[in-house]
Amino acid sequence: MVWIPQIPDLVDRLGATELADALRDPASATVPVALDDPEAGRISGAGVLAAWLAVQDTWRAERKVEIEEVATTFGDGRAVGEWVVHLEGPDGERTGLPVAAAVDPASPLPVRIHHSRRPLLGRHVVRRPMLRPDPRARASDVVGAYKAAVDAGDTAAVVAAFAPDGTFRGPSGDAYRRVGTKELTELYESYFSAGGGIPLKLCTVTEDGTRSAFEYICDRWGDTELPPQPGLTVCTRGGDGLIASARVYDDVEAPVE
């Protein structure tokens, strides 16, 4: 249940002015509008969207929300925005919730919001997929090698795709941040201890030469079958061509400790 007010700005930058206007003011919408949120699910229609945005305004005020921009990736007619939403939790403590949104004006579902609900609820929540896998979707160069290594459960190949000081941040934020070869090796050895790799089914790939953002469906982790669930990962390349950072946005519960 997190709406980022900057999302319409990304829509504008893609040239979809009418959609951007509809997201800012659904009452004046001149085009169909739809989005998908981890809690609310699919939201379509001006009236439903207007009511949901009003609830969001109240929620942001109550939680004393501050939004930190992380990065934006443009490519293939899409944009992927990343933010950290700093907010007040139920216990009064401040927490940071990583949020990403895929903005895709040509899609029947032009705004797809990705984040874990664990930082808000203390638990994972299964979410139904928003897209179908696309067998044509491919991540390029080192990011493609990283994705293939994750699929195969090859820890050495995964870590080799990262720079020596590369970082991984999980969906729940900086508490799940790992830095450098040693920590990344330990992380992926743990991930692959459930019987093998994590074969992600790609749906979209958005690349700008520096970053690759890919939406996917996860329905297996090692030898454990999972309910099909959506997610998004953004990898940033460093000057050496290796992955400087990988940031994951999903709510998949790993079958490992």
Listing of model-derived features with the role each one plays in the protein:
Residues 1-21, 119-160, 164, 255-257:
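Short, low-complexity N-terminal intrinsically disordered segments enriched in polar/charged residues
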Residues 10-37, 99-106, 111-115:
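Structured N-terminal alpha/beta-domain signature
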Residues 54-138, 185-257:
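A beta-strand edge to alpha-helix "cap/lid" segment located at domain peripheries
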